[in-house]
Protein backbone atom coordinates (compact mmCIF):
# COMPACT_ATOMS: atom_id res chain seq x y z
CA UNK A 1 0.00 0.00 0.00
CA UNK A 2 2.77 2.47 0.93
CA UNK A 3 4.44 2.14 -2.47
CA UNK A 4 1.14 3.04 -4.15
CA UNK A 5 0.94 6.29 -2.16
CA UNK A 6 4.42 7.51 -3.07
CA UNK A 7 4.24 10.12 -5.81
CA UNK A 8 6.98 10.02 -8.41
CA UNK A 9 8.65 13.23 -9.58
CA UNK A 10 6.75 13.17 -12.88
CA UNK A 11 3.29 13.07 -11.27
CA UNK A 12 1.18 16.05 -12.44
CA UNK A 13 -1.23 17.15 -9.67
CA UNK A 14 -4.35 19.23 -10.09
CA UNK A 15 -3.24 22.85 -9.79
CA UNK A 16 -4.48 26.33 -10.61
CA UNK A 17 -2.54 27.58 -13.63
CA UNK A 18 -3.05 31.20 -12.59
CA UNK A 19 -1.48 30.51 -9.18
CA UNK A 20 1.51 28.79 -10.80
CA UNK A 21 1.81 31.69 -13.26
CA UNK A 22 2.00 34.20 -10.40
CA UNK A 23 4.62 32.09 -8.63
CA UNK A 24 6.79 31.88 -11.73
CA UNK A 25 6.48 35.63 -12.28
CA UNK A 26 8.19 36.19 -8.92
CA UNK A 27 11.35 34.41 -10.07
CA UNK A 28 14.27 36.19 -11.77
CA UNK A 29 14.70 35.57 -15.50
CA UNK A 30 18.00 33.78 -14.90
CA UNK A 31 16.23 31.26 -12.66
CA UNK A 32 13.45 30.72 -15.21
CA UNK A 33 16.12 30.11 -17.84
CA UNK A 34 17.97 27.52 -15.76
CA UNK A 35 14.79 25.78 -14.61
CA UNK A 36 13.45 25.44 -18.13
CA UNK A 37 16.62 23.76 -19.36
CA UNK A 38 17.02 21.47 -16.34
CA UNK A 39 13.35 20.39 -16.49
CA UNK A 40 13.57 19.68 -20.20
CA UNK A 41 16.73 17.62 -19.67
CA UNK A 42 15.07 15.63 -16.86
CA UNK A 43 11.50 15.19 -18.11
CA UNK A 44 11.41 16.30 -21.72
CA UNK A 45 8.53 18.44 -22.92
CA UNK A 46 6.32 19.52 -25.82
CA UNK A 47 9.07 21.59 -27.45
CA UNK A 48 9.70 20.42 -31.01
CA UNK A 49 13.45 20.03 -30.81
CA UNK A 50 16.32 18.95 -28.56
CA UNK A 51 17.82 20.76 -25.58
CA UNK A 52 20.41 22.50 -27.75
CA UNK A 53 17.70 24.10 -29.87
CA UNK A 54 15.79 25.04 -26.72
CA UNK A 55 18.92 26.70 -25.33
CA UNK A 56 19.36 28.73 -28.51
CA UNK A 57 15.70 29.75 -28.41
CA UNK A 58 15.92 30.97 -24.81
CA UNK A 59 19.21 32.77 -25.46
CA UNK A 60 17.61 34.58 -28.38
CA UNK A 61 14.61 35.62 -26.28
CA UNK A 62 16.85 37.00 -23.52
CA UNK A 63 19.03 38.86 -26.03
CA UNK A 64 15.88 40.52 -27.40
CA UNK A 65 15.03 41.62 -23.87
CA UNK A 66 11.62 39.95 -23.72
CA UNK A 67 9.54 40.41 -20.61
CA UNK A 68 9.38 37.78 -17.93
CA UNK A 69 5.79 36.84 -18.75
CA UNK A 70 6.84 35.71 -22.24
CA UNK A 71 9.11 33.01 -20.82
CA UNK A 72 6.52 32.06 -18.17
CA UNK A 73 3.82 31.66 -20.84
CA UNK A 74 6.14 29.44 -22.86
CA UNK A 75 6.78 27.26 -19.81
CA UNK A 76 3.08 26.81 -19.00
CA UNK A 77 1.45 26.75 -22.44
CA UNK A 78 4.15 25.62 -24.89
CA UNK A 79 6.71 23.42 -23.14
CA UNK A 80 4.44 21.77 -20.51
CA UNK A 81 0.81 22.46 -21.52
CA UNK A 82 -0.51 19.48 -19.52
CA UNK A 83 0.69 21.05 -16.27
CA UNK A 84 3.84 21.04 -14.17
CA UNK A 85 4.70 17.96 -12.13
CA UNK A 86 5.36 17.80 -8.39
CA UNK A 87 9.13 18.05 -8.86
CA UNK A 88 8.79 21.23 -10.92
CA UNK A 89 6.38 22.79 -8.44
CA UNK A 90 8.75 21.93 -5.59
CA UNK A 91 11.67 23.60 -7.35
CA UNK A 92 9.59 26.75 -7.95
CA UNK A 93 8.76 26.99 -4.24
CA UNK A 94 12.35 26.40 -3.17
CA UNK A 95 13.74 29.00 -5.58
CA UNK A 96 11.21 31.48 -4.18
CA UNK A 97 12.57 30.70 -0.73
CA UNK A 98 16.07 31.58 -1.96
CA UNK A 99 15.14 34.75 -3.87
CA UNK A 100 12.55 36.02 -1.35
CA UNK A 101 13.65 34.60 2.02
CA UNK A 102 11.73 37.22 4.01
CA UNK A 103 8.44 35.62 2.87
CA UNK A 104 9.10 32.50 4.95
CA UNK A 105 8.97 32.26 8.75
CA UNK A 106 10.66 29.57 10.83
CA UNK A 107 10.47 28.03 14.28
CA UNK A 108 13.44 26.24 15.91
CA UNK A 109 13.39 22.86 17.64
CA UNK A 110 16.21 20.89 19.23
CA UNK A 111 16.87 17.20 18.58
CA UNK A 112 17.30 15.34 21.87
CA UNK A 113 18.31 11.80 22.80
CA UNK A 114 16.37 9.75 25.29
CA UNK A 115 18.67 10.95 28.10
CA UNK A 116 17.97 14.59 27.23
CA UNK A 117 21.34 15.28 25.61
CA UNK A 118 21.44 17.15 22.27
CA UNK A 119 21.65 15.01 19.14
CA UNK A 120 23.53 16.38 16.14
CA UNK A 121 21.44 15.52 13.09
CA UNK A 122 23.58 14.10 10.28
CA UNK A 123 21.79 13.14 7.10
CA UNK A 124 22.53 11.11 4.02
CA UNK A 125 20.14 13.01 1.73
CA UNK A 126 19.19 10.19 -0.66
CA UNK A 127 18.65 7.68 2.16
CA UNK A 128 16.77 10.23 4.27
CA UNK A 129 14.38 11.14 1.44
CA UNK A 130 13.75 7.46 0.66
CA UNK A 131 13.01 6.52 4.29
CA UNK A 132 10.93 9.63 5.01
CA UNK A 133 8.80 9.14 1.93
CA UNK A 134 8.31 5.46 2.81
CA UNK A 135 7.17 6.38 6.31
CA UNK A 136 4.79 9.12 5.19
CA UNK A 137 3.37 6.98 2.38
CA UNK A 138 1.92 4.57 4.93
CA UNK A 139 -1.00 6.99 5.21
CA UNK A 140 -0.66 9.84 2.71
CA UNK A 141 0.15 10.40 -0.91
CA UNK A 142 3.36 12.35 -0.53
CA UNK A 143 6.31 13.94 -2.27
CA UNK A 144 9.62 14.92 -0.65
CA UNK A 145 12.22 17.26 -2.15
CA UNK A 146 15.54 18.33 -0.60
CA UNK A 147 18.14 20.88 -1.68
CA UNK A 148 21.32 22.48 -0.34
CA UNK A 149 21.01 26.23 0.18
CA UNK A 150 23.41 27.96 -2.24
CA UNK A 151 24.94 30.30 0.36
CA UNK A 152 24.16 28.77 3.78
CA UNK A 153 25.35 25.51 5.40
CA UNK A 154 21.84 24.07 5.59
CA UNK A 155 19.80 21.35 3.88
CA UNK A 156 16.16 22.30 3.32
CA UNK A 157 13.45 19.66 2.88
CA UNK A 158 10.07 20.38 1.30
CA UNK A 159 7.34 17.89 2.25
CA UNK A 160 3.95 17.93 0.57
CA UNK A 161 1.09 15.60 1.39
CA UNK A 162 -1.97 14.91 -0.76
CA UNK A 163 -5.34 13.30 -0.11
CA UNK A 164 -8.54 12.78 -2.07
CA UNK A 165 -10.73 15.34 -0.32
CA UNK A 166 -8.96 16.39 2.91
CA UNK A 167 -10.68 13.40 4.50
CA UNK A 168 -7.93 12.44 6.94
CA UNK A 169 -6.63 15.85 7.86
CA UNK A 170 -10.12 17.18 8.59
CA UNK A 171 -11.20 14.18 10.67
CA UNK A 172 -11.28 15.21 14.37
CA UNK A 173 -10.68 11.67 15.67
CA UNK A 174 -7.91 10.83 13.22
CA UNK A 175 -5.93 9.06 15.93
CA UNK A 176 -8.70 6.49 16.45
CA UNK A 177 -8.92 5.33 12.81
CA UNK A 178 -7.70 1.72 12.57
CA UNK A 179 -5.63 0.46 9.63
CA UNK A 180 -8.45 -1.56 8.05
CA UNK A 181 -10.81 1.41 8.05
CA UNK A 182 -8.03 3.66 6.80
CA UNK A 183 -7.19 1.42 3.84
CA UNK A 184 -10.88 1.07 2.95
CA UNK A 185 -11.20 4.83 2.77
CA UNK A 186 -8.01 5.06 0.74
CA UNK A 187 -9.39 2.58 -1.81
CA UNK A 188 -12.71 4.42 -1.91
CA UNK A 189 -11.19 7.79 -2.76
CA UNK A 190 -8.22 6.60 -4.80
CA UNK A 191 -9.90 7.39 -8.10
CA UNK A 192 -10.61 11.02 -7.17
CA UNK A 193 -8.23 13.92 -7.89
CA UNK A 194 -5.68 14.49 -5.16
CA UNK A 195 -5.87 17.67 -3.12
CA UNK A 196 -2.56 19.02 -1.88
CA UNK A 197 -1.77 20.52 1.49
CA UNK A 198 0.44 23.55 1.85
CA UNK A 199 4.10 22.45 1.66
CA UNK A 200 5.88 21.98 4.96
CA UNK A 201 9.57 22.88 5.23
CA UNK A 202 12.24 21.52 7.54
CA UNK A 203 15.79 22.89 7.47
CA UNK A 204 18.77 20.94 8.82
CA UNK A 205 21.84 23.11 9.59
CA UNK A 206 25.07 21.17 9.20
CA UNK A 207 26.61 19.86 12.45
CA UNK A 208 23.86 21.22 14.68
CA UNK A 209 21.21 19.70 16.97
CA UNK A 210 18.84 22.57 16.06
CA UNK A 211 16.43 22.19 13.16
CA UNK A 212 14.14 24.87 11.71
CA UNK A 213 10.64 24.18 10.44
CA UNK A 214 7.48 25.88 9.19
CA UNK A 215 5.30 27.61 11.77
CA UNK A 216 2.25 25.36 11.17
CA UNK A 217 1.07 23.64 14.35
CA UNK A 218 -1.85 21.53 13.11
CA UNK A 219 -2.12 17.74 13.02
CA UNK A 220 -0.47 17.66 9.63
CA UNK A 221 2.62 19.53 10.89
CA UNK A 222 2.95 17.33 13.97
CA UNK A 223 2.71 14.15 11.92
CA UNK A 224 5.43 15.36 9.56
CA UNK A 225 7.81 16.08 12.47
CA UNK A 226 6.95 12.74 14.04
CA UNK A 227 7.76 11.01 10.77
CA UNK A 228 11.11 12.83 10.56
CA UNK A 229 11.81 11.82 14.16
CA UNK A 230 11.21 8.16 13.29
CA UNK A 231 13.32 8.46 10.15
CA UNK A 232 16.43 9.75 11.94
CA UNK A 233 15.97 7.45 14.97
CA UNK A 234 18.15 4.60 13.74
CA UNK A 235 19.75 3.31 16.96
CA UNK A 236 17.91 5.34 19.59
CA UNK A 237 14.74 7.38 19.85
CA UNK A 238 15.16 11.04 18.92
CA UNK A 239 12.59 13.67 19.84
CA UNK A 240 12.24 17.33 18.84
CA UNK A 241 11.68 19.90 21.57
CA UNK A 242 10.58 23.45 20.67
CA UNK A 243 13.20 26.09 21.46
CA UNK A 244 11.10 29.26 21.25
CA UNK A 245 7.53 30.26 20.45
CA UNK A 246 8.06 33.38 18.34
CA UNK A 247 8.84 32.64 14.67
CA UNK A 248 11.79 34.25 12.90
CA UNK A 249 11.49 35.70 9.42
CA UNK A 250 14.03 34.51 6.78
CA UNK A 251 16.28 31.45 6.85
CA UNK A 252 19.30 33.80 6.94
CA UNK A 253 18.14 35.43 10.17
CA UNK A 254 17.37 32.22 12.02
CA UNK A 255 20.66 30.67 10.86
CA UNK A 256 22.50 33.66 12.34
CA UNK A 257 20.53 33.52 15.59
CA UNK A 258 20.41 29.78 16.23
CA UNK A 259 22.49 28.01 13.59
CA UNK A 260 26.16 26.94 13.71
CA UNK A 261 27.29 30.57 13.72
CA UNK A 262 29.48 32.57 16.08
CA UNK A 263 26.76 35.22 16.11
CA UNK A 264 24.29 32.80 17.72
CA UNK A 265 25.63 33.58 21.21
CA UNK A 266 27.11 37.00 20.42
CA UNK A 267 24.33 39.46 19.67
CA UNK A 268 23.91 43.14 20.51
CA UNK A 269 27.00 44.60 22.23
CA UNK A 270 28.85 41.26 21.81
CA UNK A 271 28.66 41.16 18.00
CA UNK A 272 32.21 42.48 17.70
CA UNK A 273 33.51 39.20 19.17
CA UNK A 274 31.64 37.14 16.60
CA UNK A 275 33.01 39.22 13.72
CA UNK A 276 36.49 39.52 15.34
CA UNK A 277 36.35 43.33 15.33
CA UNK A 278 37.28 43.85 18.97
CA UNK A 279 41.04 43.93 18.35
CA UNK A 280 43.53 43.79 15.51
CA UNK A 281 45.23 40.52 14.71
CA UNK A 282 48.91 40.24 15.78
CA UNK A 283 49.60 39.46 12.12
CA UNK A 284 48.41 42.93 11.04
CA UNK A 285 50.76 45.86 10.47
CA UNK A 286 51.43 47.23 13.95
CA UNK A 287 52.29 50.65 12.46
CA UNK A 288 48.63 51.06 11.54
CA UNK A 289 47.38 50.24 15.03
CA UNK A 290 45.08 52.84 16.54
CA UNK A 291 47.42 53.20 19.50
CA UNK A 292 50.06 54.69 17.18
CA UNK A 293 48.00 56.40 14.51
CA UNK A 294 45.42 57.93 16.83
CA UNK A 295 41.68 57.94 16.39
CA UNK A 296 39.80 59.94 13.77
CA UNK A 297 37.35 62.48 15.12
CA UNK A 298 35.36 62.89 11.91
CA UNK A 299 31.88 61.37 11.98
CA UNK A 300 30.48 59.68 8.89
CA UNK A 301 27.63 61.69 7.37
CA UNK A 302 24.15 60.15 7.63
CA UNK A 303 20.75 61.15 6.34
CA UNK A 304 19.45 61.59 9.88
CA UNK A 305 19.36 65.38 10.19
CA UNK A 306 19.07 65.38 13.97
CA UNK A 307 22.55 63.85 14.27
CA UNK A 308 24.10 67.10 13.01
CA UNK A 309 21.86 69.35 15.09
CA UNK A 310 23.39 70.98 18.12
CA UNK A 311 19.97 71.03 19.76
CA UNK A 312 18.54 67.88 21.30
CA UNK A 313 15.90 66.87 23.81
CA UNK A 314 17.97 68.19 26.71
CA UNK A 315 19.16 71.39 25.03
CA UNK A 316 22.41 72.37 23.32
CA UNK A 317 25.14 69.71 22.99
CA UNK A 318 28.79 70.12 22.06
CA UNK A 319 29.79 68.34 18.80
CA UNK A 320 32.48 66.23 20.45
CA UNK A 321 30.17 65.19 23.28
CA UNK A 322 27.50 64.28 20.74
CA UNK A 323 30.00 62.25 18.71
CA UNK A 324 31.12 60.29 21.75
CA UNK A 325 27.52 59.70 22.85
CA UNK A 326 26.49 58.39 19.41
CA UNK A 327 29.55 56.15 19.30
CA UNK A 328 28.71 54.81 22.75
CA UNK A 329 25.17 54.04 21.58
CA UNK A 330 26.49 52.27 18.49
CA UNK A 331 28.80 50.06 20.55
CA UNK A 332 25.98 49.23 22.94
CA UNK A 333 23.57 48.06 20.24
CA UNK A 334 25.88 46.94 17.41
CA UNK A 335 29.05 45.88 19.23
CA UNK A 336 31.43 48.26 17.42
CA UNK A 337 31.73 51.95 16.64
CA UNK A 338 31.34 51.23 12.92
CA UNK A 339 28.03 49.41 13.28
CA UNK A 340 26.85 46.78 10.82
CA UNK A 341 25.84 48.92 7.82
CA UNK A 342 28.80 47.84 5.70
CA UNK A 343 28.30 44.17 6.53
CA UNK A 344 24.58 44.30 5.73
CA UNK A 345 25.27 46.18 2.50
CA UNK A 346 27.88 43.65 1.40
CA UNK A 347 25.63 40.72 2.31
CA UNK A 348 22.73 42.27 0.37
CA UNK A 349 24.96 43.02 -2.61
CA UNK A 350 26.30 39.46 -2.66
CA UNK A 351 22.76 38.09 -2.35
CA UNK A 352 21.45 40.23 -5.23
CA UNK A 353 24.38 39.33 -7.47
CA UNK A 354 23.82 35.65 -6.75
CA UNK A 355 20.06 35.61 -7.25
CA UNK A 356 18.93 38.48 -9.42
CA UNK A 357 21.54 38.95 -12.14
CA UNK A 358 20.83 37.90 -15.70
CA UNK A 359 22.87 34.99 -17.08
CA UNK A 360 24.91 37.26 -19.39
CA UNK A 361 26.03 39.40 -16.46
CA UNK A 362 23.71 42.35 -17.04
CA UNK A 363 21.67 43.63 -14.17
CA UNK A 364 18.03 42.73 -14.05
CA UNK A 365 16.19 46.04 -13.76
CA UNK A 366 13.02 44.35 -12.51
CA UNK A 367 14.66 42.32 -9.79
CA UNK A 368 12.43 43.43 -6.93
CA UNK A 369 11.70 46.20 -4.46
CA UNK A 370 14.58 48.34 -3.16
CA UNK A 371 15.88 47.59 0.31
CA UNK A 372 16.98 50.47 2.53
CA UNK A 373 19.66 50.12 5.18
CA UNK A 374 20.08 52.72 7.90
CA UNK A 375 22.70 53.10 10.60
CA UNK A 376 20.15 51.60 13.00
CA UNK A 377 19.52 48.40 11.02
CA UNK A 378 20.33 45.39 13.18
CA UNK A 379 22.35 42.50 11.83
CA UNK A 380 19.26 40.36 12.42
CA UNK A 381 16.08 42.46 12.75
CA UNK A 382 13.87 41.14 15.56
CA UNK A 383 10.16 41.77 15.02
CA UNK A 384 8.63 40.43 18.22
CA UNK A 385 9.99 39.83 21.71
CA UNK A 386 8.74 39.99 25.28
CA UNK A 387 10.34 40.46 28.69
CA UNK A 388 8.97 39.91 32.19
CA UNK A 389 10.66 41.91 34.94
CA UNK A 390 10.48 40.52 38.47
CA UNK A 391 11.96 42.29 41.46
CA UNK A 392 11.50 41.77 45.17
CA UNK A 393 10.56 45.02 46.90
CA UNK A 394 9.65 45.06 50.58
CA UNK A 395 9.22 41.26 50.60
CA UNK A 396 6.84 41.46 47.63
CA UNK A 397 7.49 40.28 44.05
CA UNK A 398 6.70 43.10 41.64
CA UNK A 399 6.13 41.97 38.04
CA UNK A 400 6.18 44.15 34.91
CA UNK A 401 5.63 42.71 31.44
CA UNK A 402 7.07 44.36 28.33
CA UNK A 403 6.05 43.36 24.80
CA UNK A 404 7.74 44.80 21.72
CA UNK A 405 6.58 44.59 18.11
CA UNK A 406 8.05 46.20 15.00
CA UNK A 407 10.21 45.73 11.93
CA UNK A 408 13.45 46.08 13.93
CA UNK A 409 12.85 46.43 17.67
CA UNK A 410 16.42 46.95 18.85
CA UNK A 411 17.19 49.21 15.89
CA UNK A 412 14.30 51.41 17.00
CA UNK A 413 15.54 51.52 20.60
CA UNK A 414 18.98 52.46 19.27
CA UNK A 415 17.45 55.39 17.39
CA UNK A 416 15.60 56.57 20.51
CA UNK A 417 18.92 56.54 22.38
CA UNK A 418 20.53 58.63 19.64
CA UNK A 419 17.68 61.13 19.94
CA UNK A 420 18.42 61.28 23.68
CA UNK A 421 14.94 60.05 24.53
CA UNK A 422 16.49 57.08 26.36
CA UNK A 423 19.55 57.26 28.59
CA UNK A 424 21.99 54.68 27.22
CA UNK A 425 23.57 54.27 30.67
CA UNK A 426 20.25 52.89 31.92
CA UNK A 427 19.80 50.37 29.07
CA UNK A 428 20.55 46.78 30.19
CA UNK A 429 22.08 44.25 27.83
CA UNK A 430 18.85 42.32 27.34
CA UNK A 431 17.21 45.53 26.06
CA UNK A 432 20.09 46.09 23.61
CA UNK A 433 19.53 42.77 21.83
CA UNK A 434 22.26 40.61 23.35
CA UNK A 435 19.82 37.68 23.67
CA UNK A 436 18.72 37.82 20.05
CA UNK A 437 15.16 36.71 19.39
CA UNK A 438 14.66 35.06 22.78
CA UNK A 439 12.05 36.35 25.19
CA UNK A 440 12.64 35.82 28.88
CA UNK A 441 12.30 36.79 32.50
CA UNK A 442 14.59 39.27 34.25
CA UNK A 443 14.85 38.33 37.91
CA UNK A 444 16.79 40.87 39.97
CA UNK A 445 18.65 41.97 36.84
CA UNK A 446 19.55 38.48 35.54
CA UNK A 447 18.07 37.34 32.22
CA UNK A 448 16.50 33.87 32.16
CA UNK A 449 15.52 32.53 28.74
CA UNK A 450 11.85 31.70 28.30
CA UNK A 451 11.19 27.98 28.63
CA UNK A 452 8.89 26.43 26.05
CA UNK A 453 6.27 23.97 27.30
CA UNK A 454 7.76 20.67 28.41
CA UNK A 455 7.62 17.64 26.18
CA UNK A 456 8.60 17.04 22.60
CA UNK A 457 7.35 15.75 19.31
CA UNK A 458 7.94 12.01 19.34
From Swiss-Prot:
- Top-level taxon in the UniProt lineage: Eukaryota
Q: Which coarse location class describes where this protein primarily resides?
A: nucleus
Record's family? Belongs to the CENP-N/CHL4 family.
Organism from which the protein derives? Saccharomyces cerevisiae (strain ATCC 204508 / S288c)
Subunit comment for this entry? Answer: Forms a heterodimer with IML3. CHL4-IML3 is part of a larger constitutive centromere-associated network (CCAN) (also known as central kinetochore CTF19 complex in yeast), which is composed of at least AME1, CHL4, CNN1, CTF3, CTF19, IML3, MCM16, MCM21, MCM22, MHF1, MHF2, MIF2, NKP1, NKP2, OKP1 and WIP1. Interacts with CTF3 and CTF19.
Q: What else is known?
A: Present with 606 molecules/cell in log phase SD medium.
Q: What does this protein do?
A: Component of the kinetochore, a multiprotein complex that assembles on centromeric DNA and attaches chromosomes to spindle microtubules, mediating chromosome segregation and sister chromatid segregation during meiosis and mitosis. Component of the inner kinetochore constitutive centromere-associated network (CCAN), which serves as a structural platform for outer kinetochore assembly.
Q: Which GO terms describe its molecular function?
A: structural molecule activity
Gene Ontology CC: one annotated term = outer kinetochore
Q: What subcellular locations does the record give?
A: Nucleus; Chromosome, Centromere, Kinetochore
- Write down the Gene3D superfamilies for this protein, in alphabetical order: 3.10.20.720
Single biological process term from Gene Ontology: attachment of spindle microtubules to kinetochore
Write the signal peptide boundaries: none
Q: Which keywords appear in this protein's UniProt record, sorted alphabetically?
A: Cell cycle, Cell division, Centromere, Chromosome, Kinetochore, Meiosis, Mitosis, Nucleus
Q: Which gene encodes it?
A: CHL4
Upper classification of the organism? Eukaryota, Fungi, Dikarya, Ascomycota, Saccharomycotina
Q: Which InterPro entries match?
A: Chl4/mis15/CENP-N
- Which named protein is this? Inner kinetochore subunit CHL4
Amino acid sequence: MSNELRLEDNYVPTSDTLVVFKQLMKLPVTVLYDLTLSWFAKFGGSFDGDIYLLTETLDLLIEKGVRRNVIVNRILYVYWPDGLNVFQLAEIDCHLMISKPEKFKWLPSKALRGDGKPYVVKLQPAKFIENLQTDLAKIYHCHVYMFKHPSLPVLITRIQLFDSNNLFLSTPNIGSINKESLYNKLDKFQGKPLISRRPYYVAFPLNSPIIFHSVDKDIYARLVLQSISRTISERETIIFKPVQKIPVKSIHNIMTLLGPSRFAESMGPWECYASANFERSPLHDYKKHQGLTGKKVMVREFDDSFLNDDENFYGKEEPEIRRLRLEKNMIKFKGSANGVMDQKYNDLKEFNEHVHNIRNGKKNEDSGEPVYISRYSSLVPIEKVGFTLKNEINSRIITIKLKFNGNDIFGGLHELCDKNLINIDKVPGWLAGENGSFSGTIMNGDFQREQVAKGGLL
